[in-house]
Amino acid sequence: MDGRGPYGLACQNCAKGKVKCIAMPDGDGCQRCHRLKKPCHPSHGVRKRESQHFQSPLIEEMDAKLDSVLSLLQSVYLQPSSPNGQAQQYKRKASTPELSSPTQPARTSVSESTYILPPGPLTSPDIVDAEGALNRFREEVLRFCPFLYLPPGLTARQLQQERPFLFETILSVMTRSVQEKMNWSKRIKSTIAHSMVMENESNIDLLLGLLVYACWSQDHYLKRMPTLTRIVELAVSVVMDLNLNKPPPPDAHRLTELGGGNDPNWTRKGPKIRTAEEKRAVLGCFFVSSIISSYFYQMDAMRWTLQMEEDLGSLAASPEWPGDAALAVHVRLQLLAENARKLRDEHGTKPVHIPFFLKSFRFELEAIRNSIPPDLQKDDTILSQLHYVELSIHETAFTANVIPHSINTNNPIGPDAVDCMWHSLLAIKSWDTIYRRMPPDDHTRWSIIQWIHLSRAVVTLYRLSTHPAPDWNRDAVYKTLNIVDVFTHIRASFDQLVPNPGGPFPNDFWAHGWLLGRAIATWLHAPGRLHPPNTDEPTAWAQTSSSHNGEQVLPTWNPPAPALQPQPIQESLQFTNPAWMDGLGLPPGDPTGGMHQAAGLHPTGQMHF
């Protein structure tokens, strides 16, 4: 008779009767079979239970969708590139990435990749040649915000290996196709989300790529919302994680400061030697965050520190390329504008004392102007920033913006405010002189910095041209700088950016910018918007003018009946408000549709100049 098996193996008779099977003390069968005098045979195995499936319809539907997505990704990555230049397949690898050939598919392995991003239909000839895109960015674009140095000998393959995310962002900003910009936007943001949220990465590659994307992606226009503030805030967070803005404090009390655990060779690390690349990146992050925060008002600028002051001094003293000296001047000027904003904010809702406020900042601005290196004193990007900061200081001291129903527009603003507004007008006029001598093609290379310069200049000029204060001479504003002429020149500059005039409307980003310019011009020329003054009669303001530092200053004004009507103050140019663009006939979320009618285009989509 066989012995008992392991737990759960009853003999055949006990198993059939579904009773407890207890072995005999001598191991010869079980007690039940011995009592019933039956042969005791062990069973041969455990009866397998039938598995129960509780698959909900929702899970089955999700599994089906996941299978379709995986099959789509596999089909995209396994298909060869087209002969006319299919975009390279870019991937983020745990090992060193490699630039794929335009005529061969990228060698991609799921096992060796940290994550893979599916490429969009990026077939524009402007970016298929990565070397050409890199050279154009280095030679034509980077000078408008020089927080990055790309040596002349640096190739696209080397840049992709050393700075893969920066490489992708450069390619993304160098295309003019609206659809490709949107495709790149999804890829870049997917990379940002995975790297910073899922993988908790912080490195110089991410920081530089974020700054490039913030400066040149035009994402705020494509998405019709101020998304750049979040991108810049992410860049600031990378700076904080890397301690680029300041070293760890000496009283740091994290648990890791106690020692290296079981490692006998652990020693506390000393201060890290900062590279020039890191110094440029942190200074560029401050520059971009400060000027974007002053435009969108949805974030605070990066705080200035002593470490950044040292970086600024060392970069200006030992520049590796001309952009280092230019970056130092840009940062100095923007720091002055930021300090003016901080001083204004400290007063809260109370108005600042205009003469005292302007005295110190004008002195500092003049000191920076005199310290500009000789080879940069005629640089248009530097001069544009100089006049922008001058305008910012005077607008901070006293703004020409009038909020409807909040103040009595019949009250005079006083000579100090008039003087401040007049200097704002002179700063805009100086900026306009610089702008008019820039070639129209520079618009395609501008960073967000230059676009903010233009926006503040035209918005403030509009407010000065329609300010209702009785002691402010709108006739003199119109004679000094005609806002209609300014917009006419802007529109003429954009006209030269449109490819194939008179043909079908192209999928070109700057063609849409041309449409926006025409829409604004149409809005400005609407009946009742602006009324030119009578320029034949001499103004009382011109008779009481005085001189200040060689410039004409008009401190007081006793006007006749105003010739320039201020009715549209409540409709002031609100470039930061998406609803304002919708009012021009631009539907939200679509940078193409709806603009034709607002710009005066033919319904067939033909461009008529």
Swiss-Prot record:
**Record CDD domains:** fungal_TF_MHR (cd12148), GAL4 (cd00067)
According to the record, the residues making up region (Disordered) are 82-118
Q: Where in the cell is it found?
A: Nucleus
Q: Which InterPro entries match?
A: prtT, Zn2-C6_fun-type_DNA-bd_sf, Zn2Cys6_DnaBD
Among the GO biological process terms of this entry, one is: regulation of DNA-templated transcription
Which GO molecular function entries does the Swiss-Prot or TrEMBL record give? DNA-binding transcription factor activity, RNA polymerase II-specific; transcription cis-regulatory region binding; zinc ion binding
Q: Which PROSITE patterns match?
A: ZN2_CY6_FUNGAL_1 (PS00463)
Listed under GO cellular component are: nucleus
Q: Which Gene3D superfamilies match?
A: Zn(2)-C6 fungal-type DNA-binding domain (4.10.240.10)
Q: Which residues bind DNA?
A: 11-40
Q: Which SUPFAM superfamilies match?
A: Zn2/Cys6 DNA-binding domain
Query: Chief localization class?
Result: nucleus
Q: Which regions are flagged for Polar residues bias? A: 97-114
Which UniProt keyword terms apply here?
DNA-binding, Metal-binding, Nucleus, Transcription, Transcription regulation, Zinc
Q: What does this protein do?
A: Transcription factors AN6788 and AN6790 act in tandem to regulate the expression of the non-reducing polyketide synthase pkfA from the aspernidine A biosynthesis cluster. They do not control the expression of the other genes involved in aspernidine A biosynthesis, nor do they regulate the expression of the highly reducing polyketide synthase AN6791 and the esterase AN6793 with which they are predicted to form a secondary metabolite biosynthesis cluster.
* Protein name as catalogued: Transcription factor AN6788
Per the UniProt record, the source organism is: Emericella nidulans (strain FGSC A4 / ATCC 38163 / CBS 112.46 / NRRL 194 / M139) (Aspergillus nidulans)
User: Which classification does the entry list for the species?
Assistant: Eukaryota, Fungi, Dikarya, Ascomycota, Pezizomycotina
